[in-house]
Amino acid sequence: MKSLPHITLCVSPLSWGYMTTYTFFNHAGGVGKTSATRDFGYELASRGHRVLLVDFDPQGNLTSFLGADKWGLNQDATLLAALLEDDPNAVQSRLPATVEVHGLSLYPATIDLAIAEAQLLAKIGRERRLSNILNHLPQAYDYVLIDSPPSLGTLTVNALVAADSVITPVATRFKAVDGLPGLTRMVNELQWVKPSLGFAAFLPTMYDQRNRHDSDVLEMIREQLAPLAPVLPPVRYRAADHNDASMSGQPVQVYKPGSEAARDMAQVVTAFLELQGQPA
C-alpha cells in the first residue's frame, strides 16, 4: 500500500443538540458506501435521532435503496434547482420536499443531478452550494448524512465541503485499500477551502472473517488508518441480506431484524457515538 499523505485530524466531540453533517465518501465504487449510509442513518433514527439523508449521487441508488420512486419525483423542485439558484435567500423555495421513509427524511436524487457537474463550473461559490442548502433547511435535524458520488468531481467537492467531517467506508480488499492515498490527498487539499475538514472515522465493509485476505487487509486498515481517524468495527458482508434489502427498498435492519448484518451496524453506530462522546 502506498504511504498516506499527511492530513490534519479533525475529530472533535460534538455538542448535543446541534446538527452535525457527515459525508460518506470513497471515490472507489463497490465498497458498500450507499448501503452503509442508509443503514447507519436508520440505526441513528431508531435511537431517537432526527436524521436527514441527502442522496447526492446522480445514480440515485440511495433513493432507490430506500424504496423511493426517483422517476416519479417533482422535477421543478430538485437538488439541482437548489444548487443552481443564485439567490441564497431563494434556495429553500427550490428544495424538493423530503421523502419520509423508515423514520428518516430523504432529499432524493433525480437523474438531472448529473448535469450539475458542468453547470456548477460557471457558478460563484460552486464548492459551497450544498453547504448553503444545508444552512437553509426548513426544519431541524440532529444528523445529516450525505451519500457522495464515487468520483472526484464538483458534486463530490460540494459534498465534502458541506460536511463537518468524513466517514469513509473501506472494503477489506487490497485493491480498495491501495486507492486510499488519492482519497486522503483530496481531503487534504480541500482544507484550503475548509480548514476544519477531516475524517471522523473509517468503516471497514464487505468483510468476510472466513477469508484470510480479508483478515489481513482489516489488520492493514487498522494499522495504517488509525493515525488519521478511528477505525470502526467491520461490517460483515452477507450478500443475500444486503442485496435483498436494497432490492426491497429497506434498511437491512427493517428487512431482516436481528440478522448478523443488522447487529454489525448496531455495533458500528454504538462505537461511533461513544467516540463522539454521545449516548449510545
Residue ranges of predicted features:
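P-loop NTP-binding core
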Residues: 1-280
